[in-house]
Amino acid sequence: MSSVAKKDKPTMSVTALINWARPAPPGPPQPQSASPAPAAMLQQLPTQSMQSLNHIPTVDCSLDMQWLNLEPGFMSPMSPPEMKPDTAMLDGLRDDATSPPNFKNYPPNHPLSGSKHLCSICGDRASGKHYGVYSCEGCKGFFKRTVRKDLSYACREERNCIIDKRQRNRCQYCRYQKCLACGMKREAVQEERQRNARGAEDAHPSSSVQVSDELSIERLTEMESLVADPSEEFQFLRVGPDSNVPPRYRAPVSSLCQIGNKQIAALVVWARDIPHFGQLELDDQVVLIKASWNELLLFAIAWRSMEYLEDERENGDGTRSTTQPQLMCLMPGMTLHRNSAQQAGVGAIFDRVLSELSLKMRTLRMDQAEYVALKAIVLLNPDVKGLKNRQEVDVLREKMFSCLDDYCRRSRSNEEGRFASLLLRLPALRSISLKSFEHLYFFHLVAEGSISGYIREALRNHAPPIDVNAMM
């Protein structure tokens, strides 16, 4: 397995790159290209911190809004081919080019970790036997939604479309037909729904919280497929001449800015398609995303970094211990080493992410269902300043609390207090998030004034619609 760096949102990765990058290769300097529209990275800092940094010159870290379409291979016409991000310039960051192309790596307690079967429908790694055949979570969810909602599809080609891991979302008709041909049983879906309904009644006979069928942990787990494909090319984004970033580091920092913007764009799409979130007032949607994007991206880095933690070892006295974590996964296929983080002056943040988040998550054996539920809870925070309708947000968050509590009771019934243990990870996440954001703001890689407009524009026009029947 190739090494990967720790999880961190664009804020941390951009900051760290300032000292992690190697000097630019010899030769004439690259021509400066005009900067596209302002990029958005945001989050409110305490007023005192904001005022103390007012003297720092602003940075032009901009993004072409068309790029929010997330089309693979999109390059801005203002970015010549030679200006594509050069990962070889990033000291401490390694591209996992040797990773098997057909299998993605999963954290130790991920539902797909250790699976030896392939999905009969698309060939992805199977999470188990569902409705009669070995299948992945994506095809399982697709088949279940099709049956439960009695959906019908049409093929635009000749009803013989290729259904594999990369093309399974292109034709729903052929995907459904392949599910049937491989042996998936419609009646098994209905039987499962009846069993779940009876179980819910027995577990909470007098519960006043009615969790909708749409807002569920299962649905949120399927939505994780919205994460951008790491194999896609990134439009090159230049850091402006007035930034605090040393000139020789601006190219690699710009590359990470671009990666960060792409992840934020995917985050906007993910948030918008959470059931009922889109029914909130647009202003409230913007406020919620603006207040949580930093934590959510940092949480994703901690989740991915679990895979790169070394296993515990048994000492002579029978106790168990682990070595200091050395790798953080900034994004799929890219890792950051602890030495590089220390050289950049963010070693303390690096260690906190791995020790207070990744290690604790592994100790808890946090699975993906719990992870996505916590992400939704972070987003749906009724205490965020500026909300117009806190009650609606509070109702949604209470539903997520109920979903997570119910999941813990069903899946870990022998672990009393698990629900509370999971929630106790959130204060640490918040604290680390604020500290990492201070570094981003210092280098003016966060456009505080334009983030709200960026999110609003993405929610209105630029975020591509998600077909819930074709997710994963």
Curated annotation (Swiss-Prot):
InterPro entries: NHR-like_dom_sf, Nucl_hrmn_rcpt_lig-bd, Nuclear_hormone_rcpt_NR2, Nuclear_hrmn_rcpt, Retinoid-X_rcpt/HNF4, Znf_hrmn_rcpt, Znf_NHR/GATA
SUPFAM superfamilies cross-referenced by the UniProt entry: Glucocorticoid receptor-like (DNA-binding domain), Nuclear receptor ligand-binding domain
Major localisation: nucleus
Ranges for region Hinge: 192-198
Places the protein is found: Nucleus
DNA-binding region: 119-191
Calcium among keywords: no
GO-annotated molecular function: nuclear steroid receptor activity; sequence-specific DNA binding; zinc ion binding
A single Gene Ontology CC term: nucleus
Zinc-finger ranges (NR C4-type): 119-139, 155-179
Region described as Modulating: spans on this chain: 1-118
Pfam families, A to Z: Hormone_recep, zf-C4
Keyword DNA damage belongs to the record: no
Keyword annotations from UniProtKB, A to Z: DNA-binding, Metal-binding, Nucleus, Receptor, Transcription, Transcription regulation, Zinc, Zinc-finger
Residues annotated as domain NR LBD: 212-462
Function, as annotated: Receptor for ecdysone. May be an important modulator of insect metamorphosis.
UniProt record similarity statement: Belongs to the nuclear hormone receptor family. NR2 subfamily.
Domain notes: Composed of three domains: a modulating N-terminal domain, a DNA-binding domain and a C-terminal ligand-binding domain.
Subunit structure, interactors included: Heterodimer of USP and ECR. Only the heterodimer is capable of high-affinity binding to ecdysone.
Protein name: Protein ultraspiracle homolog
Organism of origin: Choristoneura fumiferana
